[in-house]
């Protein structure tokens, strides 16, 4: 039995490879009940689980898929950064760590990752659950060259060639999401004037700040996501690849039609369990002896 854990913006999702699923809203998670919730919600006993594929926050403190017992500070450089801290993901991580259940921690994509050197310009590219989502595409859609765009509270895109992650464009860099987005000129002025912190500016930098109609919001999301995807196609061309397009996130189905029109191709929408399932698949393959997952080394 293998479990994957997707530390999402709104909820933490758990999935097994035999399609057991559990979603816990981050605001409702209490560390003392996590193990019970997992066992009851997934109908299993943790003592019989071979390995858990765990994700947490930015994942910028590690570069390898690492045995949880070897990880310090939950695999991050520092607490805080881009996004609102709630504590649910921390409770899940700590509960699993204290339970002594065997677990690996997935890294995020950042400037110390094994990616194209040009994509290391920005300090952070994608959180660890995007690695799980990419592995899901590689494993279950059998695609070796693709671009993954996750459109939800924020928008993050990731490029893969020959089953290796080449780099990612983080939520704070380019396309906005529904609630979060990059800092524009006005946001920088607001931060400099003391009106808000940079994190607050990012956390409120999505399309909701514009009070758009649903039609205009979808149109804007689709356009910016398409531009971000096209930017990563430029990277793939350097590797003689043309990537298939996969969409994740809560807004994926809503933007698909317009996004496909912009790109002149058809994308595939992934469901909300794909990242957790991909993390479980990584756990299974690491358990089976894999030393490299999509260009990321394993230290198990």
Q: Which residues fall in each region the model found?
A:
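Nucleotide/phosphate-binding catalytic cleft detector across ATP-hydrolyzing
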Residues: 1-4, 58-145, 166, 170-171, ...
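Gly/Thr-rich phosphate-binding beta-strand-loop-beta motif of the actin/hexokinase/Hsp70
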Residues: 1-24, 143-168
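N-terminal phosphate-binding loop and adjacent alpha-helix
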Residues: 20-54, 58-87
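Glycine-rich phosphate-binding loops at beta-strand->alpha-helix junctions
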Residues: 240-259
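Glycine-rich phosphate-binding/hydrolytic loop that grips phosphoryl groups
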Residues: 257-258, 264-300
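Adenine-nucleotide phosphate-binding core of ATP-dependent small-molecule kinases
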Residues: 196-240
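Glycine-rich phosphate-binding loop plus the immediately following alpha-helix
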Residues: 120-145, 162-213
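Active-site nucleophile and cofactor-binding loops and adjacent substrate-binding regions
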Residues: 83, 122-131, 149-153, 267-275
